[in-house]
């Protein structure tokens, strides 16, 4: 067993704290868990310091800038120390300001439809995203992005094979009505449809409080499960009720 507790880092790349544990029952299998909290670090430096984050949160590669990141994760490993994705559980919160959304085929197509003015440099004033990973799927809770002439809410799911199912609610735009965009597929091949604005009331004061409560509860369930494994209080992670659409249904009630 290898265990690190409250390992701290201070550098020109940022600062952070890490606790982690690795255990192996035999040469064929093992398990690991970590609790990470980093402040004011460049996204590319975060990925280079902790390559596993790129596996857990592939959407990070779409952003450039400085972020704060809090993450807890646990998983089982095979004999080559590769993550067994079905066993992966993770909770992550990202906060950043003056972020740049990197150009990609998906964004290029959407920006054409929405007539973004600044297509070469897509600056986001601020971003605060909460995500959980469970059952080979990452759920991104709805969050607000303000960019160019638009205010949009984004949420959805992304599989570990990089396929995704996202919804974008356009809350403010030059168009005099609200609309939604469903995007499904992979970065190489995807489809999008104009739909109803699913999140139009989700960020009203009353619904925002309920959404925050749901996010906190789901994150806490994942976090407690990870800490439980790290503290070796149980050999099996506790059962966690899937968040999925049920979380949004709770907010909508």
Model features per residue range: what roles?
Residues 1-10, 14-126, 133, 155-253:
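Membrane-proximal interfacial segments on either side of biological membranes
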Residues 133-161:
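Extended serine/threonine-enriched, polar tracts that run as long, contiguous segments within proteins
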């Amino acid at each position: 067993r290898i265990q690190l507790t409250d390992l701290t880092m201070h550098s020109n790349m940022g600062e952070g704290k890490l606790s982690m544990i690795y255990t192996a029952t035999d040469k064929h299998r093992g398990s690991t868990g970590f609790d990470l909290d980093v402040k004011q670090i460049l996204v590319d430096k975060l990925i280079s310091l902790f390559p596993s984050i790129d596996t857990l949160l592939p959407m990070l590669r779409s952003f450039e800038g400085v972020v704060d990141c809090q993450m807890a994760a646990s998983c089982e490993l095979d004999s080559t120390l590769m993550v067994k994705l079905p066993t992966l559980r993770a909770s992550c919160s990202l906060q950043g300001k003056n972020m740049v959304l990197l150009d990609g085929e998906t964004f290029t197509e959407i920006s054409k439809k929405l007539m973004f003015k600044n297509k070469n440099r897509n600056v986001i004033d601020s971003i605060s995203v909460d995500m959980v990973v469970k059952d080979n799927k990452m759920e991104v809770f709805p969050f607000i992005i303000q960019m160019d002439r638009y205010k949009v809410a984004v949420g959805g799911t992304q599989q570990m094979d990089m396929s995704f199912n996202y919804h974008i609610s356009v809350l403010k735009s030059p168009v005099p009505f609200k609309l939604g965009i469903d995007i499904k597929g992979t970065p190489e091949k995807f489809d999008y449809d104009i739909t109803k604005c699913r999140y139009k009331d989700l960020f009203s004061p009353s619904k925002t409080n309920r959404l925050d409560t749901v996010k906190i509860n789901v994150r806490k369930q994942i976090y407690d499960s990870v800490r439980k494994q790290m503290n070796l209080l149980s050999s099996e992670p506790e059962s966690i009720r899937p968040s999925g659409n049920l979380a949004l249904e709770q907010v909508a009630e």
